[in-house]
Amino acid sequence: MLLLDYDGTLAPFHVDRSLAYPYHGVVSLLDNIMRCGKTRVIIISGRPIVELRTLLTPMSDLEMWGSHGLERQLSDGSYSRVQVGEEDAASLTEAEEWVVAAGLLSRAEIKLGGIAIHWRGLPPAEARKVQALTQEGWGPLAERSGLKLLQFEAGLELRVSHPDKGDAVRAILADLDTEVPIAYLGDDLTDEDAFQVLEGRGLSILVRAAYRETIARAWLRPPQELIAFLEQWRSDVGG
C-alpha cells in the first residue's frame, strides 16, 4: 500500500495553488503502479478533495482522503465526509471574522474544518509580518477553543484537532492485513501524525529538498529521488 501526501510531496509548491500540478512523470508512474493490481494507492492531503480531483484529473479512480481526513473518496467515486462539531464551527467562524478584520482575506483559504493563511510569494519582510500577525490573532483562539494552529510551508492553518492525517492512516490500517507492506510519503509537520501511526508497522518517508527533524525513517529529495522511488516500486510490483 502506498499512502501519499500531495503538496510538497507529489507536486512542487506554487504561489497559485490551482497550478500546483504533480512533478513530471508522477501521474503515469502512479497509474502504472495501480494498473498492476498489487498496490492500493491513496492520497492523504490537507487539500479539499474537489481540488485534488482537478489536479489529478487523469486518475479519476484514485482513492483520496481530503481536508486532513474530514473527506474521503473511494476508488469507485463514492464520497463521504465528517461533520464539524458546533463548537468547532463557531470557533472557525470567529477565526474567519478575525481574518476579515485584519485585512488578510486575500491571503486566506477557507476550507472544510479549517482556515489557512498563505504568504508564499511575498517579500521576506512582508511574509514575516503576515506570519506574526496571524500567530498573534489566532494563537489565543487556538488555546481557548481546542483548535490546532499548525505551521506548514509558507503558511499557518487553524483547524479542528481531529481527524488528522494520523486518524486517516489509522482508519486505513484497521481494514488492512498486517502482512501488507505499507509506505507513507509526506513533507510537512501535519504528516508527522501519519508517521507516528506507522511506527512499527510501515515505512515513513520524508519528501523534502532540505532535511528537517522528523520521526520518518527515510528521506527523499524531490523530484529525482521521489521518481526513482516510484520507479522502483513499479518494478517491484511488476509494472
Question: For each predicted feature, which ranges?
Answer:
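Mg2+-dependent phosphoryl-transfer enzymes with acidic/Ser/Thr/Gly-rich catalytic loops
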Residues: 166-239
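Substrate-recognition "cap/lid" segment bordering the active-site pocket of phosphatases
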Residues: 67, 74-90, 144, 150-178
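Substrate-recognition/cap helix-loop segment adjacent to the acidic, metal-dependent catalytic center
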Residues: 47-67, 125-146
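A structural signal for isolated positions on well-ordered beta-strands in alpha/beta enzyme cores
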Residues: 40-42, 63, 148, 183, ...
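Active-site phosphate-binding/coordination module
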Residues: 21-111
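Residue-level signal for inorganic ion chemistry
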Residues: 8, 64, 117, 169, ...
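Asp-based phosphoryl-transfer active-site loop
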Residues: 1-16, 43, 169
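Charged, glycine-interspersed solvent-exposed loop segments at helix/strand-loop junctions
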Residues: 106-124, 146-159
